[in-house]
A protein has these predicted regions:
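A contiguous loop/helix-start segment that scaffolds small-molecule binding in enzyme catalytic cores
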Residues: 20-21, 98-189
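Class I S-adenosyl-L-methionine
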Residues: 1-50, 61, 156
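Predominant activation on well-ordered alpha-helical scaffold segments within soluble catalytic domains
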Residues: 9-12, 35-39, 60-64, 118-121, ...
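A generic local secondary-structure boundary/capping motif
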Residues: 12, 64-66, 90-94, 123-125, ...
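Class I SAM-dependent methyltransferase SAM-binding "motif I" and its flanking Rossmann-like core
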Residues: 31-99
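Conserved active-site and cofactor/substrate-binding residues in soluble primary-metabolism enzymes
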Residues: 2-6, 29, 33, 57, ...
Length: 189
């Protein structure tokens, strides 16, 4: 972290020399990835063509492991305050909770932000029931992958790290066979 601009400039400089260059990042380059920054830096390299190739982001990868939590409207929110002030993150959490979105949290904890998931859960519980179905997936598609389904009040005291993606259900989300499922609203089911 913190050397992303340098990586982008280096990629463009190498491309300027006639090389074919790839910028690799985890997940999907267009979801908390490098695609936006590549376009921003690319303004200074108008002769270089960019192609963004989609990947599998933690939200969709983790959702598949948990069951089907993202079947209805949802939002992604990063708890990292490195590039976004906490006040803005807090406002987004409250708005998402009030609107009854399923919320997928990225970057739920770090050494400096060990209590941010607790803060996020407290904010969510202003509009969501403590019994809201939630889930976590750690090390998605890696060795040591783990998934857990729990309530929002249990999530509040769950230990997570930067390799964990957190899913907070909406008022319709339920647990089915230890999987997290958000109904789409089909009748007669």
């Amino acid at each position: 972290m913190k050397k992303e601009v340098d990586r982008c400039v280096l990629a463009f400089e190498e491309a300027k020399k006639g090389k074919t260059v790839s910028m690799i990042c985890s997940g999907d380059a267009g979801v908390y990835g490098m695609a936006g920054l590549m376009y921003e830096v690319g303004v200074n390299y108008p002769e270089t063509e960019l192609e963004i190739i989609p990947g599998v982001t933690a939200a969709t990868g983790g959702a598949a492991v948990l069951g089907a939590p993202l079947i209805h409207d949802f939002c992604l929110i990063s708890l990292s305050d490195l590039l976004t002030p906490w006040e803005k993150i807090e406002a987004r959490l409250l708005a998402a909770a009030q609107a009854d979105f399923v919320v997928c949290l990225y970057n739920p904890s770090s050494k400096k932000r060990h209590d941010y998931l607790q803060k996020a859960c407290d904010l969510m519980m202003k509009y969501k029931s403590p019994d809201t179905i939630c889930g976590t997936v750690s090390n998605i598609a890696r060795d040591g992958e783990e998934a857990h389904v729990m309530t929002l009040k249990e999530l509040r005291d769950t230990q997570v790290d930067m390799f964990t993606t957190v899913f907070i259900g909406n008022s319709q989300t339920k647990e089915i066979s230890n999987k997290m499922v958000t109904p789409r609203g089909y009748r007669n089911v």
